[in-house]
Amino acid sequence: MARFDGKVVLVTGAGSGIGRAISLAFAGEGSRVVVADVDVNTGEETAHALTEIGAEAVFLQADVGKEEQVKAMVHKAVATYGYLDCACNNAGIAGTMARVADCTEENWDRTIGINLKGVWLCMKHEILQMLKQGHGVIVNTSSAAGLVGLQGWSPYVASKHGVIGLTRSAALEYAKANIRVNAVCPSIIKTGMAQCFTGGDQRVEAYILGQQALNRMGTPEEVAAAVLWLCSEEASFVTGHALAVDGGLLAH
């Protein structure tokens, strides 16, 4: 019997990268997966990939920065499968590179709006459902940049620090309701977003990788494995934790 047989899992930002890997990993362990993404094409591709391996999956389009869409997403997920065991709030963007004094209000608002407000909105409506059913697990995607500073990416760094703060607060607020809340904090992972940070410059990439003790990029599947562990009964005594999946970056 797989760890997640019959479990219902919601994954945002599931159309590509880490979100897609999380969806595939849950599907491979027996979950019914609600694939959520703002991009219809990539979201439907992920849902199709899950059904191709014999999993139950449904795609829901949602902009996580808009409450009515998030509320509808959670409602439709529960209407489809009856309940919500796990939620992985993974949708996010890199935003535009900017130092604090150079950042535009538009860049700040967009990055915070998706990466931080979006996670809060998802948590809000997921928790309301989990309170009704008496249990649940949430894993939010933060970043290694949520644990340290990073020059030139102030909106992104602020948003990811905020995700960890939300995670810890919610973990304390809802522990007695049998709801666990954790975060996963990847460093540079082999996804399209990595290009946003390196600009495709091999020298920049080499420098970043040199800061990671394992001297390579992580894979989406490695992050997904950490997420599944946090959602599993194996991590039943873990809540309020920010788990770095960083190749040793933060060991320095």
State where each predicted segment sits.
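Canonical Rossmann dinucleotide-binding motif of NAD(H)/NADP(H)-dependent dehydrogenases/reductases
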Residues: 2-34
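Short C-terminal tail/terminal secondary-structure segment
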Residues: 94-97, 148, 228, 239-252
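Substrate-binding pocket helix/loop in short-chain dehydrogenase/reductase
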Residues: 98-100, 104-112, 208
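Active-site helix of classical SDR
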Residues: 123, 159, 167
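Residue(s) in the substrate-gating loop at a strand-loop-helix junction
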Residues: 143
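Short, small/polar-rich loop/turn modules that mediate ligand/substrate recognition or access, typified
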Residues: 175, 180, 238-240
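C-terminal helical subdomain
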Residues: 183-186, 203-238, 247
